[in-house]
């Protein structure tokens, strides 16, 4: 009668046992006819190594084990084992016997383990999980980290032998179809799958309505239909839900099993104008995408943090969530239902395919799992099946083979699109393209779905903001009868960087604000876009990325630990008419050049136009040329990264030995001197250095989409540095410290009018004696090249009391 949940409690991980709560009969919780045991903590083995300074992260096979005593009283019950998600392959063993295998890391799966269990004894369960590359399982590659582990709940379920299905795609076996809905009435058809013959009683209730239906089970399925007059419709503003309680009785009328589901009543369509209509009202779909990872946790998030995400997206003013690039679990979808977010959901078919039957079969299985596990959710209004599938095609050097590959890929997309329509004819399908529309259109991808999603980053990866307008116009002329969504747009930004002179790839909040201030109004006003989803709600793990926040894609409106950025407040100000958010987005404190006071530490971000606030809340100012009575550099030019799209203002490398990467990713190269006119006294001078160039061509992030550094012919760098009258140092950063490593060099100097710097190799500084305040004395750092050009990344001058 009762459903029992026995949890895995011991994790065996790379030879190390990690224990959760010990098994205790007293910890069983009963709810109605059910009882369940608290689950072990969700886990990934990549929570930390995906962001460390070592390239790559662990991708391999690991084992979770548990021993579970199954009471003899369970001998007449059925047992199934359910896993919410394990990335990306899983092999289940019970008492040493192989039970089953599952491919795919983002959907739930379940196995009937009854034949393998020993009642009245301790049973040994082993779940082997691998996140190793497998050419037959999507995603093959992607701009996100493939965390390994059992990161959603796993449990052993005991039911009576007669029960609602636990093996049908790991659902509760009850499905609600609501294709006929209007203001005046709604028709709902309910199907319940069972393990055997019996009678099903269904109680549908909500919003003042209640009705009991009865149906007999035939061939493992019971079906009933009802009409609800004047239904309380579901929408983002009024997310009204109904419930259906399902009871299964045996032939003697004895209650055997009970489950419940929620559902919503709404109707929607994309109209003749290609806009989205919900319950007869035109709605512009606007919101974001979300990745399911969190700083220091990977993808093993507790429900509390997942709930916070969805509430923050709603509070931003969003009505739409693109659940990308994979299904994200029952709890997330329940939240979208209950607070009112329209959703698209997609399988992780990203970047490329493998031209094998096994790969295609796994794609189809993922579609089946996605649809069956999410079809009851009223929030889901779009099924999607691929993202940027031609972004990383093989055979680029062989035009004939490339063309054949593209045709094979298009065939797979057409097959998946047809399968989605067969699985669920009530929801439209979507394919998402990167900014290479001509190639997709040429091979027929644009005809392989009901909706076309466009990922456009004009003004970030290349071009200018106006490229968005031109691309949308081009696509709508080619597809006049196809609804279009702007499914991705965004600019990487680090909240620590602010500037009055924003430029592409400076990672400043201010450039990101410029970007979104063009894109969001365009989406809202465009008569050709049904909506848009900013990429992304949160900064997310992408191990191969090497920007201002290495190993993260930092296009999020909030940080990886969910601190809102100014871009979040900008969206809130527009979508919620919140003037407070608008003021927050407009705030930028200007720091003006002025004579340096003895008590004011001077911190300069060389080669940069940005203010940088470090983790200790110390502000580093942008560089300036030397001015009499103040401070600044003499000679040189800002370091720039040369790409096929032009020169960018910062190196795209992971700076080792620091989290303040932006300080070291910019620099002034060819610098001759740095001078500050200071009151007499003792100062600590810290030169921050890092070598940003190498003689060999580095393998940079493939996701910078053409913004990878080009070879500069760099042959090395060696320089002599002298601080005031201290002995000079000869520095070769690569030989002495290694490339891309933060090197702080600290000096202590005393300055007084009688202690002017002197060096036969000193550069010729501007004569400022006439304008220098009489109570200041120059502090100088002099640079002389031995080979290559001198470099200075950042500098501190700190008065010593």
Can you name each region flagged by the protein language model?
Residues 21-82, 135, 141, 147-150, ...:
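Extended carbohydrate-recognition surfaces in non-catalytic/accessory domains of CAZymes
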Residues 22-52, 116-185, 192, 259-267, ...:
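An acidic-aromatic loop/edge-strand motif
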Residues 118-120, 191-271:
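Extended acidic/polar, glycine-enriched regions
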Residues 23, 30-32, 59, 86, ...:
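Substrate-binding clefts and catalytic carboxylate motifs of secreted carbohydrate-active enzymes
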Residues 64-66, 107-111, 220-226, 672-676, ...:
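Short strand-edge motifs at loop-to-beta-strand transitions and within beta-strands
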Residues 106-110, 114, 124, 135-138, ...:
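Active-site mouth of glycoside hydrolases
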Residues 587-760, 767, 771-801:
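Compositionally biased, intrinsically disordered or flexible polar/acidic segments
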Residues 30-31, 59-167, 196-197, 341-344, ...:
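Accessory beta-strand-rich segments of carbohydrate-active enzymes
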């Amino acid at each position: 009668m009762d459903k029992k949940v026995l949890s895995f409690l011991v994790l065996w991980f790379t030879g190390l046992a990690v224990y959760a709560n010990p098994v205790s009969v007293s910890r069983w919780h009963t709810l109605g006819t059910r009882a369940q045991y608290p689950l072990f903590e969700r886990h990934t083995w990549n929570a930390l190594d995906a962001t460390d300074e070592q390239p790559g992260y662990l991708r391999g096979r690991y084992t979770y084990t548990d021993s579970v005593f199954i009471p003899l009283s369970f001998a007449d019950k059925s047992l199934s084992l359910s896993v919410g998600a394990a990335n990306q392959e899983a092999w289940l063993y019970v008492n040493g016997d192989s039970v089953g295998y599952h491919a795919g890391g983002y959907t739930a799966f379940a196995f009937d383990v009854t034949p393998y269990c020993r009642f009245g004894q301790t049973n040994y369960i082993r779940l082997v999980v691998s996140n190793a590359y497998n050419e037959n399982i999507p995603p093959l590659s992607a701009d996100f980290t493939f965390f390994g582990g059992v990161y959603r709940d796993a449990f052993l379920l005991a039911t009576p032998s007669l029960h609602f299905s636990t093996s049908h795609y790991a659902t509760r076996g009850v499905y609600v179809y609501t294709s006929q809905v209007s203001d005046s009435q709604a028709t709902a058809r309910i199907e319940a799958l069972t393990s055997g013959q019996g009678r099903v009683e269904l109680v549908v209730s909500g919003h003042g309505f209640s009705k009991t239906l009865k149906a007999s089970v035939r061939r493992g399925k019971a079906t009933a239909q009802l009409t609800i007059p004047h239904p309380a419709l579901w929408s983002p503003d009024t997310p009204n839900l109904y419930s259906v309680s399902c009871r299964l009785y045996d032939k003697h009328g004895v209650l055997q099993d009970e489950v419940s589901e929620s559902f919503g009543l709404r109707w929607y369509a994309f109209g003749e104008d290609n806009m989205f209509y919900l319950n007869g009202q035109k709605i512009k779909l606007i919101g974001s995408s979300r990745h399911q990872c969190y700083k220091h946790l990977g993808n093993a998030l507790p429900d509390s943090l997942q709930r916070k995400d969805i509430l923050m997206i709603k509070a931003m003013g969003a009505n739409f969530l693109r659940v990308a690039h994979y299904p994200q679990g029952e709890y997330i979808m329940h939240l979208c239902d209950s607070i009112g977010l329209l959703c698209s959901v997609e399988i992780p078919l990203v970047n490329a395919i493998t031209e094998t039957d096994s790969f295609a079969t796994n794609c189809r299985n993922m579609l089946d799992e996605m649809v069956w596990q999410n079809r009851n959710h009223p929030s889901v209004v779009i099924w999607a099946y691929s993202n940027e599938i031609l972004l990383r095609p093989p055979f680029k050097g062989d035009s004939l083979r490339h063309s054949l590959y593209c045709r094979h890929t298009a065939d797979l997309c057409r097959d998946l699109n047809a399968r989605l329509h067969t699985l669920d004819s009530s929801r439209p399908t979507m394919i998402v393209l990167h900014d290479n529309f001509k190639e997709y259109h040429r091979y027929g991808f644009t005809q392989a779905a009901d909706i076309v999603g466009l990922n456009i980053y004009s003004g970030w990866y290349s071009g200018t903001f106006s490229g968005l307008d031109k691309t949308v116009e081009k696509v709508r002329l080619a597809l006049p009868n196809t609804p279009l969504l702007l499914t991705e747009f965004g600019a990487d930004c680090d909240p620590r960087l602010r500037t009055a002179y924003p430029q592409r790839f400076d990672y400043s909040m201010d450039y990101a604000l410029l970007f979104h201030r063009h894109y969001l109004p365009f989406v809202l006003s465009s008569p050709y876009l049904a909506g848009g989803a900013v990429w992304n709600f949160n900064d997310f793990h992408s191990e191969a990325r090497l920007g201002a926040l290495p190993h993260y894609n930092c296009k999020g409106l909030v940080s990886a630990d969910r601190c809102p950025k100014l871009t979040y407040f900008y969206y809130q100000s527009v979508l919620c008419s919140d003037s407070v958010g608008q003021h927050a987005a407009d705030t930028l404190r200007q720091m003006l050049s002025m004579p340096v006071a003895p008590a004011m530490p001077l911190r300069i971000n060389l080669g940069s136009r940005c203010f940088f606030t470090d983790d200790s809340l110390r502000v580093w100012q942008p560089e300036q040329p030397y001015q009499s009575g103040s401070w600044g550099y003499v000679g040189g030019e800002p370091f720039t990264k040369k790409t096929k799209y032009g020169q960018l203002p910062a190196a795209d490398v992971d700076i080792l030995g620091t989290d303040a990467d932006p300080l070291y990713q910019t620099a002034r190269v060819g610098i001759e001197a740095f001078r500050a006119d200071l009151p007499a006294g003792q100062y600590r001078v810290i030169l921050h250095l890092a070598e940003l160039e190498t003689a060999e061509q580095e393998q940079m992030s493939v996701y910078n989409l053409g913004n990878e550094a080009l070879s500069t012919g760099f042959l090395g760098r060696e320089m002599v540095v002298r601080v005031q009258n201290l002995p000079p140092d000869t520095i070769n950063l690569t030989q002495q410290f290694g490339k891309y490593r933060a090197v702080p060099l600290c000096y202590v100097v005393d300055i007084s009018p009688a202690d002017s710097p002197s060096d036969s190799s000193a550069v010729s500084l501007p004569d400022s004696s006439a304008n220098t305040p009489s109570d200041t004395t120059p502090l100088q750092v002099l640079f002389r090249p031995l080979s290559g050009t001198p470099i200075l990344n950042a500098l501190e001058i700190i008065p010593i009391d």
